[in-house]
């Protein structure tokens, strides 16, 4: 099988390039080892916003009396919230697949191996190409905390699919993803602590805005440990922090 363009990685860069090439009439093969859409659609922006919307509705229901609406004993089902999130993601993934298929892009699910600049192997098949485009994205960064390899910690992927409400949760890192999960689990009644090595959360944002957001999160009950590094991961429920 020979194609004018082979693309490895079906995230936003890969599938957009594949669609554009297909529209231009080129023969295209796209390799993706997980799901089309990449991290943002499957494990990032879209699923977290879907979870947060469910949490927002639950918050409204709990405080509905403020708006002269009676909602007795508002409750939630985390399993169904996660199922709804997965349904939304699947629908969007299918939408991407339909667009690519409409432009004759050949989609191959599996981990591709580059043999040389014009040859790729995947799933026991060999594919030849005139041009090769790499859009492989990124991997989850696990901070080099001593002992972390012996701890059954969560990554964002685990948090997205978790169906049991923990009593408490410590989040190492106060960036965008960390704060999204902090907000979500706090809304469900979980005691959340955010450990951040910088002097403010959301380091890439304006500091005044970050401080305002932190104050709002604190009102919801989130505890913050700023300018704090995790010294050691002892167990699933025990982190060692510096004493100051």
Regions found by a protein language model. Give the residues of each.
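Conserved small/polar residues in nucleotide/adenosyl-binding loops
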Residues: 237-243
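Short glycine-rich, flexible loops that bind phosphorylated cofactors or substrates
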Residues: 15, 141-142, 178
């Amino acid at each position: 099988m020979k194609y004018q363009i082979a693309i490895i990685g079906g995230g936003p860069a890969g599938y957009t390039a594949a669609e554009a090439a297909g529209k231009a009439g080129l023969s295209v093969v796209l390799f993706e080892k997980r799901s089309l859409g990449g991290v943002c659609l499957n494990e990032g922006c879209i699923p977290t916003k879907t979870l947060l919307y469910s949490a927002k509705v639950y918050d409204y229901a709990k405080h509905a009396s403020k708006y002269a609406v009676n909602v007795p004993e508002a409750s939630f089902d985390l399993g169904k919230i996660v199922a709804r999130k997965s349904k939304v993601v699947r629908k969007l993934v299918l939408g991407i697949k339909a667009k690519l298929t409409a432009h004759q892009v050949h989609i191959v699910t599996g981990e591709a191996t580059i043999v040389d600049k014009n040859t790729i192997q995947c799933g026991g098949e060999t594919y030849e190409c005139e041009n090769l485009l790499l859009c492989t994205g990124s991997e989850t960064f696990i901070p080099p905390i001593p002992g972390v390899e012996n701890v059954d910690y969560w990554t964002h992927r685990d948090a997205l699919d978790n169906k049991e409400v923990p009593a408490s949760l410590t989040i190492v890192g106060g960036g965008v993803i960390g704060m999204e999960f902090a907000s979500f689990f706090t809304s469900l009644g979980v005691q959340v602590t955010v450990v951040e090595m910088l002097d403010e959360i959301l380091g890439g944002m304006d500091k005044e805005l970050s401080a305002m957001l932190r104050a709002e999160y604190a009102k919801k009950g989130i505890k913050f440990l700023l300018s704090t590094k995790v010294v050691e991961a002892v167990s699933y429920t025990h982190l060692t922090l510096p004493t100051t």
